Amino acid sequence: MLKLKLKIVFISTVLFLFIVNSLAQTANDIKTPTEFFGFQPGDDGMLFTYDELISYLKDLDQASPRLKLVEIGKSPMERSVYIAFISSTENISNLNELQIINRELALNPNINQEEREKYINQGKVFVLGTLSMHSGEVGPSQAAAIIAYDLVTTSEPEKLAFMNNSVYMMVPCHNPDGMDMIVEHYKKYKDTEYERSSMPGVYHKYVGHDNNRDFVTLTQEDTRAIARIYNQDWFPQVMVEKHQMGYTGPRYFVPPPHDPIAENIDAGIWNWIGIFGSNLMTDMTGAGLKGVSQHYLFDDYWPGSTETCIWKNVIGFLTEAASVNYASPIYIEPTELMVYGKGLSEYKISINMPDPWPGGWWRLSDIVKYEIVSTNSILKTAAANREEILEYRNNLCKKEVEKGHTKPPYYYIITKQQHDKSEFVELVNLLVEHGVNVYFLKNNVKINNRIFSDGDVIIPLAQPFRSFIKEVMEKQIYPLRHYTPDGEIIKPYDITSWSLPLHRGVNSIEINEKVIIPFSELEKISTPIDLKSKPNFDPNAFLFTVSNNESFKAAFLAISQGLNVERLTKQTEINGNEIPVGSFLITVDKDNYGSANNLLSKLSVDPIFLEDYSDFIGEKVEIPRIALVESNFHDMDAGWTRFVFDTYYIPYTVIKPGDFEKTAFVKNYDVVVFPNEDKSILMEGKYKSEDTYYITSYPPEYTKGIGVDGFNNLMIFLDQGGIIISWGKSTELFMGQLVIKHSEEDKEEFQLPVEDHSKKLKSEGLYIAGSLINVTLTSDNPITYGMEKEIGVFSKDMPILSTSIPQFDMDRRVIAIFPEEDILISGYAEKEQKLKNKAASVWLKKGKGQIVLFAFNPQFRGSTNVSFKLLFNSLLLKEIN
C-alpha cells in the first residue's frame, strides 16, 4: 500500500513538473507586451491603438490555450468588438458547457436539486470586465495587455487557483472607435504645448461620454454588443466596468456605492457588491496602493450604464481611477487634493478612504498598476466564493419568479391599439432584445372588467428579469434620502426618469390585482415583430399616418430615392379610420416599384395601400437643406441629434461655430438646428459660469465661436426666410436685444417676443432633476401634427419661456404649455408648480423667417421618442407667404 502511495505521489510530482515545464516553455514562446509594442504599457507618453491591442490578444490566443478571443459585434464605425476569455486551459476548452450552466442557473427556476448541485459543482464564476468605454480614460485598456499576458503565462499557485474557478471575460475596449480617436489626437499634439489638450468632438461616432447612458434604450451598436453578453448569450455572474475620474480626488474608487440605490434590486446584490468592494479595499491597500476610496460620489440608483446588468441579477459595479492627461503624467500639490459630492467631506483619513494618497507625480503607469491589482482581486474574490455565487444566482432567479407570482404588479399589458404603432413595435422588440419574456395574447381575455384582445402584448412579472421589467415599465418616484435626519436631500447623480412606455408615448397597463393568464393563451415572441402584410392588389400610393414616428422615416427615405411625397392638408377618413392632417402620401408606379419595395423593407409598420388617391389633397414635400450646429466641446446632444437624423434618413451638414462667418446660410440652407449647448461656447468658444470665463483645454483652432459677424450672418438668414430650431441652453442666443446689420449704414435692433425665466425660478427653488414633465400642446399647428393633446417632455436644467405682444415684423405662438397641476409625470422635481402656465415651446416669426424654441430636449439621448415629431415637423415647416 505504501509503495502504491509513493508511486502515486511520484507520478503526480512528475505530472506537476511536466505541466509547470510546459507552461514555462509556453511563456517563453509568448512575447511580452514590452516586446510586442516596443514599450511597457503605461510608460509616459506612450499609447497603443485598438488594432495593436487586438493584434496582441490574437497572438496570445494563438500561443496560449488559456485565452480565447471571440468577436461579439461591431462598433458604430464598423470596428470589431471582442471578448477575451481568460481562464485555465480546461475551462477554455469547456466554454460551451460552462455557457449552458450559466444559462440554466440564470434563467431556469425549476432545475431539479440533483441537476442544480451538478451545475454548481461544475460551474465557474464568469467575471465580465468592460474597459475604457470613455475613451479619454485610457488606463484600463492600456493595462489589458499586461493583465492578459500575466494570466496566460503565470505559474503562481494563487492565480492558477482563481483561474481554475473563474473565467475572466475581458472586453479589451468597450469603445474601439473612441480609443483610436484619442490615440490619434494624443500623438498629433505630443511634444507640443497642447500635448495635454482635450480631443475636440465626441470620442464615438455619435454619443461620446453618453455611451454609458444607453443600456436601457440600446440605441448604439457597441452598446447592444455588450448588453447581449448578459441579456442573451453568456449570463456572467459578476461584472465590473472600469473607468477613470478627476485628477485631484482619491486615486481609486471601489464599491459599495453611495445612496441612493435602486429599490427594485435584491438586497443580496448589494451585499455581494459590498463583499467585492471590501476585498478590493483590503487587497489594494495591502499592496501599498494609496488613496483607495469607497462609498463615495457614485450612486447606483439609475439604470442606463453598463451596470444596468444588476437589474438582470448580475453582481455589477464600477471602479474609477484618478486620471492623468492621457499618457502624460501630472504633478499634484498636496494642497490641491480635494473631495466633492457624496461620502467624503474632506480629503482626510476616513472610513471611506483609510489611506489617503499624499500628492506628487501621478502617472499612467500608476493607473495600470492599480488596474492590475484590482482585476486580480476581483477574480480572486469570485473564485473564492464560487459555489456561493453560483447558488445565489439560481436562488435569485427563483426568488424573482416567485415575487412575480405573489407581489404586484403581476403583468404589464401593451395593447396593440396605440397612437403610435411604430413605437409599439419598437418597444416590444427592445424588451425582447433585453432578454425579457414577452408574449402575444392569442385570444381575448377579461381582466378587471376590461377586455384585452388577441395581439395585445403580455409581459408577466414572474420571470428572472422581474427587477428590470418593473424598473423600466413603471413611472419613477425618486427615493428621498438625506445626509442627516431632516437635513439636505441627496441629489440625483444623473437623471430620474427612464420609463420606456412614458418616454415613447406608448400606453401600458399595470396589472396589480392577482390574476393568472394561462400560458396556453400566450404565444412567445422570440424574434423581432412588425405590423406588415402584403396587399392583395398593386397599390398606386402608400399613405403613412403622421401619428407614427416611422412615417417621417418613410417620407425622408422616399424623397431620397426619388419618390414623390406629399403631406395631406386636409383631414380624411378611410374605412372608418381618421387620417390626420400632415400624413404622408407617397405615389408609386411601375417605374419605381423597386424603390418603393426597398422603402417598405426598412419599415416595421405598413402604410395604408391605395389604388385610387385622387381625392387626397396635399402639398409636395421637399427635403430641407439642414445645417446642424455642433461645437467641438464634446457636444453629446448634437451627437445624439446626428444619430436621430441618421436613423430617420434626415440629411444634414454639420456646421461648427467658428464657420458661421464664412457660411452662406441664405444660399445653401433652409434650416439651422441648434441642439442643447451653452451660449458662451457657441458664441465665444469659452466656458462661462455667471460672469466668469474659464480657459478651455482644447487646441486654439477648435475654440473659435460664432462671433458677432457670424451671428449677424445667421440673423440675415432668419430675416430673409430661414428657419432656426433651438432647444435647451442654446435658446439663450435668441433672448434679449438682437441686431441685424444689413449694411454699414443699416442696422436693425430688435427683441423677439420671448423671455427665459429659468434663472429667476431656480433662485426661488425650482429644480427639475432630469424628469418627464407634462405639457399641453396647441392643436392644428404644423409643429404638432401627429401629436396627442398632452405628452411628457424631458427636462433637465432647461429654460422656462413666456411670450409677449410682438412688435413690427414679428409674431409668436405658444406651441406647448406647462399645465396648472399634475406637472410631474415621472422622476423628481422641487417646486415644480412654478412651471404652471409657462411656455414649453414657442414659435416665433421675424421678417420672413421662423424660429422654433423648445424648453426641453425633444430627442434626449435618443430616448424621448414621444417628442420626436415636434422636431421632425419643425424641420418641414413651410415658408411664410
How would you describe each model-predicted region?
Residues 1-11:
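Bacterial N-terminal signal peptides that target proteins for export
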Residues 9-21:
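Bacterial N-terminal signal peptides
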Residues 25-138, 145-166, 213-214, 221, ...:
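Intrinsic-disorder/low-complexity accessory segments
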Residues 115-117, 192-201, 226, 238-246, ...:
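Structured alpha-helical segments in the cores of large, soluble enzyme domains
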Residues 148, 165-188:
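Carboxylate/His-rich catalytic cores and anion/metal-binding grooves
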Residues 171-175, 186, 241-249, 730:
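Short, solvent-exposed turn/loop segments enriched in Gly/Ser/Thr/Pro and often Arg
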Residues 179-204, 208, 224, 228, ...:
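Active-site-proximal cap/loop segments of hydrolase catalytic domains
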Residues 196-217, 239-257:
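Core alpha/beta catalytic barrel or barrel-like domain that forms the active/cofactor pocket
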